[in-house]
Amino acid sequence: MRPDDINPRTGLVVALVSVFLVFGFMFTVSGMKGETLGNIPLLAIGPAICLPGIAAIALARKTEGCTKWPENELLWVRKLPCFRKPKDKEVVELLRTPSDLESGKGSSDELAKKAGLRGKQLPQGPGEVPMASSVTTPTPTEEGECQSLVQSGRQEETSRYLDGYCPSASSLAYSALDAKCSAWDRSDRPEPEDSIFFVPQDSIIVCSYKQNSPYDRYCCYINQSQGRWDHETIV
């Protein structure tokens, strides 16, 4: 930038159109005196020569010598269909953070529907854990309210399955998401997460319903790729 805050390219544009400005001004003054060029009055020729030069200088100032697009001007051009960029679906999915799901924004409802559909479509074997039929996300203010995630007919079967691996004595001392579980072998299971905001795509939701327990109705998920039904599954 020059000390006078004029871009050198803008000065070049002014130098090129100065000829049109001079002749346009001269023709305009002469036309005001009534002079004509044949049958054409000079008052009509002067502005026609001068105005394009003024527009070129104004455009050069707004674009800093034709080097950048004006930010606040010509906004109507950006609204045209040819200037609109389509949003990529993958980018939109990546923008959905766990905080959006926790606050009720984004795809929390869609996630619940998908989990319910997976629970109905996938067949169940005799040794598999029942799939979830619906998913609800209770907020911290609704500690006493928790809807059933397992069909009513499967609750007893799920409780018996969890009792085999989580005795009632140990369930009083540890939470399902607690990292300290000395009764289990930690080498064969992944580290539990501190908080779960969403259910993974390929997972099975398991709920425990125990009476006289501080963790009466807690839910967790089992990743199918990490679970082994023939040996032991850590919940």
UniProtKB/Swiss-Prot annotation:
Family matches, as Pfam families: TMEM215
Compartments reported by the entry: Membrane
Superkingdom: Eukaryota
Name this polypeptide is given: Transmembrane protein 215
Keyword Plastid: no
Keyword check for Oxidoreductase: no
GO biological process: angiogenesis; negative regulation of retinal cell programmed cell death; sprouting angiogenesis
Record's bilayer topology term: Multi-pass membrane protein
Location (main, coarse): membrane
Spans through the membrane: 12-32, 40-60
Alphabetized PANTHER family for the sequence: TRANSMEMBRANE PROTEIN 215
Keywords: Membrane, Transmembrane, Transmembrane helix
Gene name of the encoded protein: Tmem215
GO cellular component: membrane
Start and end residues of each stretch annotated as Disordered: 99-146
